[in-house]
Every structure is written in C-alpha cells, then in structure tokens.
C-alpha cells in the first residue's frame, strides 16, 4: 500500500512540471517559473504548487490527517507530487472528497469555459511504442525544453458541473494526450465525504489504449477563474493499492 500523504518532501525540477502543465491545463506561456510558496503544513507533505501568469491562485492548506483543503475564489492553480508507482502492481487509486457549494455552470470541452471545482490528475511517463505520430513528433521538442522525464499522457478525475458521471472528455488544452473522466457533478451530495476508487490501468486502456507501466505525478486542482465563482473543496486518504 502506498499513501500519497506520507511525510516525505520532494522537490522535482521545475521544467518537468512545466512540461506536465503544457498537457494538463494552460499553454506553456502562461506558466510561472518555479514553485510557489504554499502552506507549510502542505509543503511538508511533499506537495508543490504551480501557478499561472495573470491568474489568481488557490489557497491550499492541511485540514487534518491526510487531508488537503483548497479554497478557490475566481482562481486556478494546482499542487503536485512526483511519484514512482508500478501501475501493474498497484492499479487502484482511492480517495475521499467533498465540496461546500454546487459547481458553477461550465463546459469542460471549451477553452475559457472549462472550470471545475475539484479534480485529481494522474500523469504517465512517455511511452514511445504506444504513442501517436503527433506525440512522437512533439516529443523531441518537449525533451529538449523540459527534459526526458516530461510526462507523456494525463488522466484526470473531475468533479464537474452538468456533465454526466462517467463521461470522458478530451481536454481543450491537452487534446488527445489529456482525457478527463467525470466522477461527480452538480447533482452530487454536498458537504459530506464521498468515496472514490478507480482502476487506473483499466481507465487508461479505455481512453488511450495500451498499458502504462507506471505513474509519474499526482495532482489536485481547483479551477474557478472563468466562472468567477467560489468554492471550497477537500481531498483526503489518497492511496494506491493492488486491490
């Protein structure tokens, strides 16, 4: 069993994360250099925050044992951790999360409308054998700019607005390399902990094809800047397990 909120500080190079967010959210020109300072208690758990130019950032803080709180007020930013998880041995990821208020109306498939109050992201190392021609063509430039450890594909589990549970959506920023799976929406219960357990290996096969061998990063985000809305979200007890 691998617990995400273990008390281990990590500090990966910023250009790896820059490459990651090229896929995950904004164009690379919007990324601020380096890591932002976040709540010391969260930082001690090994998380780093990524901010974006001209965008207000969220506030991340510890909210108990193995719990992260994110307050988002017309803002967007993410916290991330580097991981080395053998996905063939520990293919399940479980966590609990909750929201304070309903998500503002948004559209995950449209740039500038794709807010989501809470999301969990998983990234995977680049896999040349199963990469598309466009991914292979782009790879040398990414590695030249951000290093060989820049991730290949991104899978995110999203608390959406009106999208149906289970719907798979291609990121308007990451394209075919970033797929979003809706887990909760504006009809989900508020103010109570809701449990999730996902088979990352099966989900990857369904949306990308092929089999990843490992996970390289995990992230938590909140995005309310397009809708100029406010929300408070919580995520706790994240862990990878074989069953």
Question: Language-model features: where?
Answer:
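Extracellular beta-strand ligand-recognition surfaces/modules
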Residues: 118-120, 175-186, 190-228
